[in-house]
């Protein structure tokens, strides 16, 4: 089951990390690719026709933002890292409301 990230405008560091992750067209393409797939870095690189080093960097940024999860699994020669979408919904309250107790 995927998660929901709900932020307020006061969660500046987390919003900055997510905004950075979403600011790249390549990272948006990776998110679309991982929408229904769990892939390793070489599969992402091959499908998007980019160097593996670029794919690894983009996935790392997406992972640091909390949008993607990467887990090591046994592979043919050692282990490989599989990446998938961690979050299916993101919302940011720009004007959060507060409950004020009445006297």
Task: Report the location of each language-model feature.
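Alpha-helical residues within the helix-turn-helix
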Residues: 46, 63-64
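Conserved segment of winged-helix/HTH DNA-binding domains
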Residues: 76-103
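Hydrophobic, well-ordered secondary-structure scaffolds
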Residues: 10-12, 31, 54
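Short, Lys/Arg-enriched N-terminal segment that forms or immediately precedes the first helix
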Residues: 2-19
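N-terminal helix-turn-helix DNA-binding core of bacterial DNA-binding proteins
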Residues: 17-18, 25-50, 79-85
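Internal catalytic or translocation cores that form aromatic/hydrophobic pockets or channels
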Residues: 40, 54, 69, 87-91
């Amino acid at each position: 089951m995927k998660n929901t990230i709900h932020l307020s405008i006061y969660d500046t560091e987390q919003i900055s990390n997510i905004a950075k992750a979403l600011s790249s067209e390549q990272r948006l393409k990776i998110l679309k690719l991982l929408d229904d797939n769990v892939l390793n870095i070489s599969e992402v690189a091959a499908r998007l026709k980019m160097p593996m080093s670029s794919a690894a960097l983009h996935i790392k940024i997406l992972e640091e933002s909390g949008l993607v999860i990467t887990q090591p699994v046994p592979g043919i020669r050692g282990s490989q890292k599989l990446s998938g979408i961690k979050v299916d919904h993101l919302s940011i309250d720009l004007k959060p409301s507060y409950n004020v107790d009445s006297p």
